[in-house]
């Protein structure tokens, strides 16, 4: 009891010297723990007469309360200082430039499709779509390719069963459009098509764009003029273009279209022709009254020519080093 004031003073001095919450807790244990200096003072009460014990106990409790208040105050100071230090370390300099948000980019094939749709949209063409799981009638028969026709063997078709398949061309969209719409018709049909082939210039899935006009007095001259303007627009230069006689079951006459490359060699870019009368009859359009032309082109092929890509498979490998070149 005689040393009580000294213990309180010693405790307060130790509290003020504590540099962090952990050191402060050590002081608390030293003075107020089960075996702490002030706690042990309570054991001296047994040495006093009974009538003096309550007053002495009150003095000890008052001393313990002083130390506890000092502990609480110091703890609040230390926690406040720690919080301020952490906030200072985490201060954001609002004058610094913000983090740049990376912009995505369109896939080069998508760029090609959008560019072609934009050009033909200005000529009054609308975009038509159709199912990728097709029946053999719309994919072959209606296009003047009956079951015995050798052209079927050239398509490397993915069949589900005897009549259902993954479409090998977007021409089926033309058939479905003509079945449901009377001339005049002016459409383009972009979409995915599938053939069982894979090498440097072929993939099992690729993109095609087909175009179709059906109206009165449509001629091959109209076809040539339309495609010539399109190619000059797409490649952004005045190209030397040639139409080479070819064969497609669904057009007559038919032609392959080539452009002169920078290396002085002809490059094949698309196929075209006048819609075969049998195709018009198959959809209930009188070929004596109406005529039309159609064309088809591979989107990957045109993209390769436009950007100088040599391996078709690069479009499908999702290599960001390749794709970022087109942002």
From Swiss-Prot:
GO BP: any one term: phenylalanyl-tRNA aminoacylation
SUPFAM superfamilies cross-referenced by the UniProt entry: Class II aaRS and biotin synthetases, tRNA-binding arm
PROSITE patterns: AA_TRNA_LIGASE_II (PS50862)
Subunit architecture: Tetramer of two alpha and two beta subunits.
Cofactor detail note: Binds 2 magnesium ions per tetramer.
UniProtKB keywords: Aminoacyl-tRNA synthetase, ATP-binding, Cytoplasm, Ligase, Magnesium, Metal-binding, Nucleotide-binding, Protein biosynthesis
Reaction equations catalysed: tRNA(Phe) + L-phenylalanine + ATP = L-phenylalanyl-tRNA(Phe) + AMP + diphosphate + H(+)
A Pfam family of this chain: Phe_tRNA-synt_N
Residues the record lists as binding Mg(2+): 252
Organism the protein comes from: Klebsiella pneumoniae (strain 342)
Name the record gives this protein: Phenylalanine--tRNA ligase alpha subunit
Primary localisation category: cytoplasm
Any one GO molecular-function label of the UniProt entry: tRNA binding
Lineage: superkingdom: Bacteria
Record-stated family: Belongs to the class-II aminoacyl-tRNA synthetase family. Phe-tRNA synthetase alpha subunit type 1 subfamily.
InterPro entries named in the record: aa-tRNA-synth_II, aa-tRNA-synth_II/BPL/LPL, Phe-tRNA-synth_IIc_asu, Phe-tRNA_ligase_II_N, Phe_tRNA_ligase_alpha1_bac, Phenylalanyl-tRNA_Synthase, tRNA-bd_arm
Subcellular localization, as worded in the UniProt entry: Cytoplasm
